[in-house]
From Swiss-Prot:
Entry text on domains: Has the structural arrangement of an alpha-helix connected to antiparallel beta-sheets by disulfide bonds (CS-alpha/beta).
InterPro entries (alphabetical): LCN-type_CS_alpha_beta_dom, Scorpion_toxin-like, Scorpion_toxin-like_sf, Scorpion_toxinL, Scorpion_toxinL/defensin
Function: Beta toxins bind voltage-independently at site-4 of sodium channels (Nav) and shift the voltage of activation toward more negative potentials thereby affecting sodium channel activation and promoting spontaneous and repetitive firing. Highly potent.
Species, as recorded: Centruroides sculpturatus (Arizona bark scorpion)
Family (UniProt): Belongs to the long (4 C-C) scorpion toxin superfamily. Sodium channel inhibitor family. Beta subfamily.
GO biological process, one term: defense response
Keywords recorded for this protein, A-Z: Disulfide bond, Ion channel impairing toxin, Neurotoxin, Secreted, Toxin, Voltage-gated sodium channel impairing toxin
Molecular functions per Gene Ontology: sodium channel inhibitor activity; toxin activity
Tissue specificity comment: Expressed by the venom gland.
CDD domains linked to this entry: neurotoxins_LC_scorpion
Domain LCN-type CS-alpha/beta: from-to ranges: 1-65
Keyword Hydrolase included in the entry's annotation: no
Name under which the protein is recorded: Toxin CsEM1
Amino acid sequence: KEGYLVNSYTGCKYECLKLGDNDYCLRECRQQYGKSGGYCYAFACWCTHLYEQAVVWPLPNKTCN
């Protein structure tokens, strides 16, 4: 499974500025999901190699504001 890293409280994606390989995204994805990968895609952190139950953006009933 893959998807955008999401803040479970706000429903917002984790933003990033350096597209492609990105240490911040990799660190955040691994911190939240263990052995996942991560990079910056469309100015948000995209996590790879997630388990199927991983929670990713968008969250039901939560809009980012």
